[in-house]
Swiss-Prot record:
<dbReference type="InterPro" id="IPR023186">
    <property type="entry name" value="IUNH"/>
</dbReference>
<dbReference type="GO" id="GO:0008477">
    <property type="term" value="F:purine nucleosidase activity"/>
</dbReference>
<comment type="function">
    <text>Hydrolyzes with equal efficiency cytidine or uridine to ribose and cytosine or uracil, respectively.</text>
</comment>
<dbReference type="InterPro" id="IPR001910">
    <property type="entry name" value="Inosine/uridine_hydrolase_dom"/>
</dbReference>
<dbReference type="GO" id="GO:0006152">
    <property type="term" value="P:purine nucleoside catabolic process"/>
</dbReference>
<dbReference type="InterPro" id="IPR036452">
    <property type="entry name" value="Ribo_hydro-like"/>
</dbReference>
<comment type="similarity">
    <text>Belongs to the IUNH family. RihA subfamily.</text>
</comment>
<dbReference type="GO" id="GO:0045437">
    <property type="term" value="F:uridine nucleosidase activity"/>
</dbReference>
<dbReference type="GO" id="GO:0015949">
    <property type="term" value="P:nucleobase-containing small molecule interconversion"/>
</dbReference>
<protein>
    <recommendedName>
        <fullName>Pyrimidine-specific ribonucleoside hydrolase RihA</fullName>
        <ecNumber>3.2.-.-</ecNumber>
    </recommendedName>
</protein>
<dbReference type="InterPro" id="IPR015910">
    <property type="entry name" value="I/U_nuclsd_hydro_CS"/>
</dbReference>
<feature type="active site">
    <location>
        <position position="240"/>
    </location>
</feature>
<keyword id="KW-0378">Hydrolase</keyword>
<dbReference type="GO" id="GO:0005829">
    <property type="term" value="C:cytosol"/>
</dbReference>
<dbReference type="InterPro" id="IPR022975">
    <property type="entry name" value="Pyrim_hydro_RihA"/>
</dbReference>
<keyword id="KW-0326">Glycosidase</keyword>
<dbReference type="GO" id="GO:0006206">
    <property type="term" value="P:pyrimidine nucleobase metabolic process"/>
</dbReference>
Length: 311
């Protein structure tokens, strides 16, 4: 039976490809998609969810727009990475359907209530919507199987020296998620920076030759440009968000450790840092499954295989 999931995202090139991967995978049942501000403004990320679902002919999936700003901070966006639209590069269709007349939290709560089995939440943007759900609906915690997030890092940040972008945008929300008592799976930069898509991988996707694989290749063409900066030392573009979906589909591609994770919300230099107790120094019980490595070729092969679904 397919695993029910709720996808909360802020498209974003890698979020868009995570949607493509999830909807090409019969092992997953995407119950709803909610949007958050992050990679672009809330209006643009919502529009990008609708555009992607229009492209994929999945306008049956309920969509709702989430929080317009973090819990306690002003919004930061990553338009320098994702462009003016949030999905610059390919020509995407205009949305042919409208979002639900409710908030992201209301749609999430409704989806959890109506599900006969616990639902996995996959969150590939800032954790604002998920934190609001957890705080406003404690009675639904038991309906959440796990929360799989793209965010954080054991080591170096990508937005500040200490912090990864998604966590930095709303560290208070991320701390609520990690300390919720619900199982958390963390795909941080330690693994996503190894999940790089090289130019030859993009050409492999393009050669599959269907409209969706072509769009994915064009998204990657644009996404690669930002990551060519020598400071990163990358061969390709790190495909952060699809690691969450890939872990659900093929956990054997990933190396994980069980550790306690906390989020720094006060630090002078370290706000938004995910503090991973790798050496068990705090005495805190592990609260997260932390991805630390990936079989890059296996990850690329999975993407290529699933893109054929759209023929």
């Amino acid at each position: 039976m397919a695993l029910p999931i709720l996808l909360d995202c802020d498209p974003g090139h890698d979020d868009a490809i995570a949607i493509v991967l999830a909807l090409a995978s019969p092992e997953l049942d995407v119950k709803a998609i909610t949007s958050s501000a992050g990679n672009q403004t809330p209006e643009k990320t919502l529009r990008n969810v609708l555009r992607m679902l229009t492209l994929l002919n999945r306008t049956d999936i309920p969509v709702a727009s989430g929080a317009v700003k973090p819990l306690m901070r002003n919004l930061i966006i990553a338009d320098n990475v994702h462009g003016e639209s949030g999905l610059d590069g390919p020509a995407l269709p205009e949305p042919t359907f409208a979002p639900q007349n409710c908030t992201a939290v209301e749609l999430m709560a409704k989806t959890l209530r109506e599900s006969e089995e616990p639902v996995t939440i996959v969150s590939t943007g800032p954790q604002t919507n998920v934190a609001l759900l957890l705080n406003s609906h404690p009675e639904l915690h038991s309906k959440i199987a796990r929360i799989v997030i793209m965010g954080g890092a054991m080591g170096l940040g990508n937005w500040t020296p200490a912090a990864e972008f998604n966590i930095y945008v709303d560290p208070e929300a991320a701390e609520i998620v990690f300390q919720s008592g619900i199982p958390v799976v963390m795909a941080g930069l330690d693994v996503t920076h190894k999940a790089q898509i090289h130019v030859e991988d993009t050409e492999r996707f393009r050669a599959i030759g269907n409209p969706v694989s072509t769009i994915v290749a064009e998204l990657l063409d644009f996404f690669l440009e930002y990551h060519k900066d020598e400071k990163w030392g990358f061969v390709g573009a790190p495909l952060h968000d699809p690691c969450t979906i890939a872990w659900l589909l093929k956990p054997e591609l990933f190396t994980t450790v069980e550790r306690w994770v906390g989020v720094e919300t006060q630090g002078k230099y370290t706000q938004g840092m995910t503090v991973v107790d790798y050496y068990y120094l705090t005495g805190n019980k592990p609260n997260a499954t932390v991805m630390v490595d990936v079989d890059r070729q296996g990850f690329v092969d999975l993407l290529a295989d699933r893109l054929k679904f759209y023929a």
